Protein backbone atom coordinates (compact mmCIF):
# COMPACT_ATOMS: atom_id res chain seq x y z
CA UNK A 1 0.00 0.00 0.00
CA UNK A 2 1.56 3.26 -1.10
CA UNK A 3 -0.70 5.33 1.16
CA UNK A 4 -2.59 4.41 4.29
CA UNK A 5 -6.36 4.23 3.83
CA UNK A 6 -9.04 5.45 6.19
CA UNK A 7 -12.52 4.31 5.20
CA UNK A 8 -15.31 6.28 6.89
CA UNK A 9 -18.69 4.57 6.58
CA UNK A 10 -21.56 6.94 7.36
CA UNK A 11 -24.46 4.50 7.49
CA UNK A 12 -27.75 6.15 6.59
CA UNK A 13 -26.28 9.34 5.10
CA UNK A 14 -27.84 10.45 1.82
CA UNK A 15 -25.27 11.17 -0.91
CA UNK A 16 -26.58 14.67 -1.68
CA UNK A 17 -26.59 15.59 2.01
CA UNK A 18 -23.00 14.35 2.25
CA UNK A 19 -21.90 16.45 -0.72
CA UNK A 20 -23.59 19.51 0.78
CA UNK A 21 -22.70 19.10 4.45
CA UNK A 22 -19.20 17.60 4.48
CA UNK A 23 -17.20 20.57 3.25
CA UNK A 24 -13.99 19.56 5.02
CA UNK A 25 -13.96 16.19 3.31
CA UNK A 26 -14.88 17.82 0.00
CA UNK A 27 -11.76 20.00 0.37
CA UNK A 28 -9.65 16.83 0.63
CA UNK A 29 -11.37 15.46 -2.47
CA UNK A 30 -10.73 18.71 -4.33
CA UNK A 31 -7.07 18.56 -3.37
CA UNK A 32 -6.77 14.99 -4.64
CA UNK A 33 -6.11 13.65 -1.13
CA UNK A 34 -9.39 11.78 -0.70
CA UNK A 35 -12.19 10.30 -2.77
CA UNK A 36 -15.95 10.45 -2.61
CA UNK A 37 -17.92 7.67 -4.25
CA UNK A 38 -21.63 7.35 -4.83
CA UNK A 39 -22.48 3.72 -4.23
CA UNK A 40 -25.34 1.79 -5.72
CA UNK A 41 -26.86 0.00 -2.76
CA UNK A 42 -27.08 -3.78 -2.82
CA UNK A 43 -30.21 -5.41 -1.50
CA UNK A 44 -31.32 -5.93 1.14
CA UNK A 45 -30.54 -2.37 2.21
CA UNK A 46 -29.72 -3.30 5.80
CA UNK A 47 -26.65 -2.44 7.82
CA UNK A 48 -24.90 -5.74 8.55
CA UNK A 49 -25.36 -7.13 5.02
CA UNK A 50 -23.98 -3.92 3.55
CA UNK A 51 -20.97 -3.81 5.91
CA UNK A 52 -20.16 -7.29 4.65
CA UNK A 53 -20.66 -6.18 1.05
CA UNK A 54 -18.48 -3.07 1.40
CA UNK A 55 -15.65 -4.94 3.14
CA UNK A 56 -15.68 -8.07 0.94
CA UNK A 57 -17.18 -6.96 -2.36
CA UNK A 58 -19.64 -9.85 -2.16
CA UNK A 59 -23.39 -9.24 -2.50
CA UNK A 60 -25.54 -10.21 0.51
CA UNK A 61 -27.39 -12.89 -1.44
CA UNK A 62 -24.02 -14.57 -2.12
CA UNK A 63 -22.44 -14.06 1.31
CA UNK A 64 -25.49 -15.26 3.23
CA UNK A 65 -25.44 -12.14 5.42
CA UNK A 66 -28.97 -11.19 4.37
CA UNK A 67 -30.33 -9.49 7.51
CA UNK A 68 -29.04 -7.78 10.64
CA UNK A 69 -29.60 -10.83 12.85
CA UNK A 70 -27.11 -13.08 11.03
CA UNK A 71 -24.53 -13.23 13.81
CA UNK A 72 -21.55 -15.26 12.65
CA UNK A 73 -18.12 -14.87 11.15
CA UNK A 74 -18.12 -14.05 7.48
CA UNK A 75 -17.29 -16.93 5.16
CA UNK A 76 -15.75 -14.45 2.68
CA UNK A 77 -12.30 -12.87 2.48
CA UNK A 78 -12.44 -9.25 3.52
CA UNK A 79 -10.11 -6.34 2.98
CA UNK A 80 -8.86 -7.13 6.50
CA UNK A 81 -7.78 -10.63 5.46
CA UNK A 82 -5.98 -9.38 2.35
CA UNK A 83 -4.23 -6.59 4.26
CA UNK A 84 -3.18 -8.87 7.12
CA UNK A 85 -1.89 -11.50 4.70
CA UNK A 86 0.19 -8.79 3.01
CA UNK A 87 1.81 -7.88 6.34
CA UNK A 88 -0.14 -4.65 6.70
CA UNK A 89 -1.59 -3.26 9.92
CA UNK A 90 -5.39 -3.17 10.24
CA UNK A 91 -7.70 -1.36 12.63
CA UNK A 92 -11.33 -0.41 13.16
CA UNK A 93 -13.32 1.92 15.35
CA UNK A 94 -16.72 0.48 14.59
CA UNK A 95 -19.99 -1.09 15.64
CA UNK A 96 -19.56 -4.56 17.14
CA UNK A 97 -21.10 -6.25 14.09
CA UNK A 98 -17.83 -5.59 12.24
CA UNK A 99 -15.94 -7.48 14.95
CA UNK A 100 -18.46 -10.32 14.70
CA UNK A 101 -18.04 -10.53 10.94
CA UNK A 102 -14.23 -10.68 10.89
CA UNK A 103 -12.74 -11.37 14.33
CA UNK A 104 -14.98 -13.35 16.70
CA UNK A 105 -18.66 -14.18 17.02
CA UNK A 106 -20.56 -13.68 19.17
CA UNK A 107 -19.18 -10.36 20.39
CA UNK A 108 -18.25 -10.47 24.08
CA UNK A 109 -17.66 -6.92 25.30
CA UNK A 110 -15.12 -7.82 28.00
CA UNK A 111 -13.03 -9.74 25.46
CA UNK A 112 -13.69 -7.94 22.19
CA UNK A 113 -14.38 -4.26 22.89
CA UNK A 114 -10.69 -3.34 22.82
CA UNK A 115 -8.76 -5.57 20.43
CA UNK A 116 -5.00 -5.74 20.14
CA UNK A 117 -4.13 -9.07 18.52
CA UNK A 118 -1.89 -9.33 15.44
CA UNK A 119 -3.32 -12.79 14.63
CA UNK A 120 -6.83 -11.45 13.98
CA UNK A 121 -7.94 -9.93 10.67
CA UNK A 122 -8.81 -6.68 12.50
CA UNK A 123 -5.66 -6.48 14.58
CA UNK A 124 -6.48 -3.33 16.54
CA UNK A 125 -9.99 -2.21 17.36
CA UNK A 126 -12.37 -0.29 19.54
CA UNK A 127 -15.88 -1.68 19.12
CA UNK A 128 -19.13 -0.34 20.57
CA UNK A 129 -22.58 -1.89 20.86
CA UNK A 130 -24.96 0.94 21.84
CA UNK A 131 -26.51 2.61 18.79
CA UNK A 132 -26.34 5.96 20.58
CA UNK A 133 -22.60 5.67 21.37
CA UNK A 134 -21.46 9.27 20.77
CA UNK A 135 -19.75 9.90 17.45
CA UNK A 136 -17.35 12.23 19.27
CA UNK A 137 -16.17 9.27 21.35
CA UNK A 138 -15.94 7.04 18.28
CA UNK A 139 -13.75 9.52 16.41
CA UNK A 140 -11.54 9.81 19.52
CA UNK A 141 -11.32 5.99 19.53
CA UNK A 142 -10.28 6.07 15.86
CA UNK A 143 -7.67 8.76 16.42
CA UNK A 144 -6.24 6.74 19.30
CA UNK A 145 -5.89 3.73 16.98
CA UNK A 146 -4.33 5.86 14.25
CA UNK A 147 -1.76 7.41 16.57
CA UNK A 148 -0.95 4.23 18.49
CA UNK A 149 -0.78 1.72 15.63
CA UNK A 150 -0.40 3.71 12.36
CA UNK A 151 -2.70 1.27 10.55
CA UNK A 152 -2.45 0.83 6.81
CA UNK A 153 -6.22 0.32 6.73
CA UNK A 154 -8.52 1.91 9.30
CA UNK A 155 -12.31 1.66 9.25
CA UNK A 156 -14.22 4.38 11.08
CA UNK A 157 -17.90 3.62 11.51
CA UNK A 158 -19.97 6.11 13.55
CA UNK A 159 -23.62 5.27 14.23
CA UNK A 160 -25.40 8.52 15.18
CA UNK A 161 -26.58 9.37 11.64
CA UNK A 162 -28.20 5.96 11.21
CA UNK A 163 -29.56 6.02 14.76
CA UNK A 164 -31.16 9.44 14.19
CA UNK A 165 -32.74 8.22 10.96
CA UNK A 166 -34.54 5.45 12.83
CA UNK A 167 -36.12 7.84 15.35
Residue locations for each model-derived region?
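Active-site-proximal alpha/beta segments of enzymes that process anionic O-linked groups
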Residues: 2, 15-149
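Active-site His/acidic residue clusters
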Residues: 140-167
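DG-centered beta-turn motif at the end of beta-strands
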Residues: 10-13, 83, 159
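A short, flexible beta-alpha/helix-coil linker loop
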Residues: 13, 61, 161-164
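Residue-level marker for buried hydrophobic side chains located in beta-strands
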Residues: 6-8
Amino acid sequence: MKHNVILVVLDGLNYEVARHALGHLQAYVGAGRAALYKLECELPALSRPLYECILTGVAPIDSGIVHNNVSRLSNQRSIYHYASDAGLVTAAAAYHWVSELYNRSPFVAARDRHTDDPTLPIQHGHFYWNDHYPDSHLFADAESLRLRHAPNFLLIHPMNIDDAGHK
